[in-house]
Amino acid sequence: MQPPGNDAPAGCPFSGARAQGTQAAHEAPHVPGDAGEQAGWHNAQLDFSKSMSYGDYLSLNAILNAQHPLSPDHNEMLFIIQHQTSELWMKLALFELRGALDAVRSDALPPAFKMLARVSRILEQLVQAWNVLSTMTPSEYSAMRPYLGQSSGFQSYQYRQLEFLLGNKNAQMLQPHAHRPDILEQVRATLDAPSFYDEVVRLLARRGFPIAPSRLDRDWRQPTQHDETVEAAWLEVYRHPQQHWELYEMAEELVDLEDAFRQWRFRHVTTVERIIGFKQGTGGTSGAPYLRKMLDVVLFPELWHVRTTL
């Protein structure tokens, strides 16, 4: 503290003239943005003219400028972002599923479990996303629907690959992508290859379970069908989990995944019914009735049927 009448010490933010005649020169209160923090905020780097920033790393300029509404309607932005973000999540789901597939082929099951769990959480995220789109009313959607043309989520090539990778194969679903040879090649490759569940069935055989040869070497372009020898293997796993712990955990991860996938499908059809009722879909399908039919698809049939047998 300075004696009354003395000038303020050097460096004090108050001028000497202001300090004179006071009982004491008070220390200036801390104010964000004061001198000393002008060059940086809490030691954070603020100059990115010569280094990579957050936006640079995430390519935000490209992502945030990828929304191009075709209608004057305010709600179209929601519709676009809902579907774009869903495609990003599906990209990650495919990435994780293919990583898990490689792990199963090499008998590295613990890493596969982690990746499968992540896919299930991604699907839960996609389920919650329908709550946002559900804020769109029928009248709001009707205002922008004419601008969509024939475009439809039915044509999502990432979703189609996800279905194929999970075993719901249908060669007719290649046709919507025939106009894009590069995309068609990707989707066809997924159709032609064993599904994730096919590789798990092969894993059962490698672990000594007597799986029918016709199940181990089949037409991979066909959807998964129930097989008695596969169910018998899962029955043994569930009856003696301690002896087959990795396979037991694999079974439960797959059930979790299909459970989440079913919830996503259900929220999809419910949202469609809420917004457009039973109108035909923009892609030419029957809309909600088509989506309801998809609710009956079972991806891993033996894992569900074995619960009745236990």
Curated annotation (Swiss-Prot):
Keywords for the protein's UniProt record, in alphabetical order: Dioxygenase, Heme, Iron, Metal-binding, Oxidoreductase, Tryptophan catabolism
GO biological process: L-tryptophan catabolic process to acetyl-CoA; L-tryptophan catabolic process to kynurenine
Recorded GO MF terms: heme binding; metal ion binding; tryptophan 2,3-dioxygenase activity
Record's keyword annotation contains Zinc: no
Binding site for heme: 268
Residues that hold substrate according to the record: 79-83, 141, 145, 282
Entry EC number(s): 1.13.11.11
Metabolic or biological pathway: Amino-acid degradation; L-tryptophan degradation via kynurenine pathway; L-kynurenine from L-tryptophan: step 1/2
Similarity comment text for this entry: Belongs to the tryptophan 2,3-dioxygenase family.
Complex formation: Homotetramer.
Protein name stated in the entry: Tryptophan 2,3-dioxygenase
Species of the source: Burkholderia multivorans (strain ATCC 17616 / 249)
